[in-house]
């Protein structure tokens, strides 16, 4: 029974990830005044499945000098971590109701750094190693602000469980009282998922394709799937934390519909940003975090810590 539960969680995620690639190509196409994919199936709707068949039927080539085991483990680990992050998300009921759901997400997302580092090192190519080092530095740096923002949210939520965020946001989205943090969180999720304008890991002019430059066929598809699964996950997490969907006990389907619509809108914003903005310079990316975001998030975190202490003597109002 538990296996069926896992399948009912993972299969829709993989289908959503497949169609996100199509939506991205369509949005980029229309923003550049062209059609995008429109040959395979009606309106190009079968394009993701055609791409998947092509990638998984190709022979997985690899350079002779690669470290075989790490070369194969890295993409597998990447997708496994991307899918396991969905376990504690309330939609409205999580697969496993973890008391420390937010900590689980933080810990698991920071493990994804290893798959990037291993893939860059195992490829035995200087381009992929440079791309991997860039990605690791960027991911670790932006995780610092994300952790501090999550800490501030926990103080408002009063629990490490993601489930209680539904109750916390019954009357008002946390986006309204904590909008500066929501803005910084959204930009940090862009950097965390290595999306434009922070896609410095795959700067074509200097790094060819980044840490996955030596990958082809199946292993490359696994990296690709992990990236898009992470995009949907980050937007789902943003929805749960800052845009708590409506929840009626008698009508849980309404929560799921609301949740999906908000996550879809945020994912579309990711694609819109990709079509609109040029890539950052690497030093600007790091300055944005260490000189702007970090002091701001620390100050806001101190504010959220001190607020309950200051208002401890004030009677609650109904």
Curated annotation (Swiss-Prot):
Alphabetical UniProt keywords: Electron transport, Membrane, Mitochondrion, Mitochondrion inner membrane, NAD, Respiratory chain, Translocase, Transmembrane, Transmembrane helix, Transport, Ubiquinone
Function: Core subunit of the mitochondrial membrane respiratory chain NADH dehydrogenase (Complex I) which catalyzes electron transfer from NADH through the respiratory chain, using ubiquinone as an electron acceptor. Essential for the catalytic activity and assembly of complex I.
TM helices/strands, residue ranges: 2-22, 70-90, 100-120, 136-156, 171-191, 231-251, 253-273, 293-313
Organism: Mus musculus (Mouse)
Primary localisation category: mitochondrion
GO biological process, one term: proton motive force-driven mitochondrial ATP synthesis
Family: Belongs to the complex I subunit 1 family.
Enzyme Commission code(s) on record: 7.1.1.2
Record keyword Flavoprotein present: no
GO MF assignments: NADH dehydrogenase (ubiquinone) activity
Signal peptide extent: none
Domain of life the protein comes from: Eukaryota
Pfam (any one): NADHdh
Membrane topology term: Multi-pass membrane protein
Subunit structure: Core subunit of respiratory chain NADH dehydrogenase (Complex I) which is composed of 45 different subunits.
Entries under InterPro entries matching the protein: NADH_UbQ_OxRdtase_su1/FPO (IPR001694), NADH_UbQ_OxRdtase_su1_CS (IPR018086)
Record-given protein name: NADH-ubiquinone oxidoreductase chain 1
Reaction equation(s) it catalyzes: a ubiquinone + NADH + 5 H(+)(in) = a ubiquinol + NAD(+) + 4 H(+)(out)
Gene Ontology CC terms: dendrite; mitochondrial inner membrane; mitochondrion; neuronal cell body; respiratory chain complex I
Localization of this protein: Mitochondrion inner membrane
């Amino acid at each position: 029974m538990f296996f069926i539960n896992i399948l009912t969680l993972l299969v829709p995620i993989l289908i959503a990830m497949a169609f996100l690639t199509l939506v991205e190509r369509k949005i980029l196409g229309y923003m550049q005044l062209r059609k995008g994919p429109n040959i395979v199936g009606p309106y190009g709707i079968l394009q993701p499945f055609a791409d998947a068949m092509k990638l998984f039927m190709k022979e997985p080539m690899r350079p002779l000098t690669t470290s075989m085991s790490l070369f194969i483990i890295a993409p597998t680990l990447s997708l496994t971590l991307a899918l396991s992050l969905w376990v504690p998300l309330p939609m409205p009921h999580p697969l496993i109701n973890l008391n420390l759901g937010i900590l689980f997400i933080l810990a698991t997302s920071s493990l994804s750094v290893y798959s990037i580092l291993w893939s860059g090192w195992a490829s035995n190519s200087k381009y992929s190693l440079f791309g991997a080092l860039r990605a690791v530095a960027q991911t670790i740096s932006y995780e610092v602000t994300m952790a501090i923002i999550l800490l501030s949210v926990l103080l408002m939520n009063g629990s490490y469980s993601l489930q209680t965020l539904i109750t916390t946001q019954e009357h008002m989205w946390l986006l309204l009282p904590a909008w500066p943090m929501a803005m910084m969180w959204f930009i940090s999720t862009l950097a965390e998922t290595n999306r434009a304008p922070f896609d410095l890991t795959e700067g074509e002019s200097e790094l060819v394709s980044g840490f996955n430059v030596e990958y082809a066929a199946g292993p490359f598809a696994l990296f690709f799937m992990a990236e898009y699964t992470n995009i949907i996950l980050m937007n789902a997490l943003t929805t749960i934390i800052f845009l708590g969907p409506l929840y009626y006990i008698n009508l849980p389907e309404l929560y799921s519909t609301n949740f999906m619509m908000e996550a879809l809108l945020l994912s579309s914003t990711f694609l819109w940003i990709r079509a609109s903005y040029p890539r950052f310079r690497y030093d600007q990316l790091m300055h944005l975090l260490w000189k702007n975001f970090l002091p701001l998030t620390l100050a806001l975190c101190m504010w959220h810590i001190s607020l309950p202490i200051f208002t401890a003597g004030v009677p609650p109002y109904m």
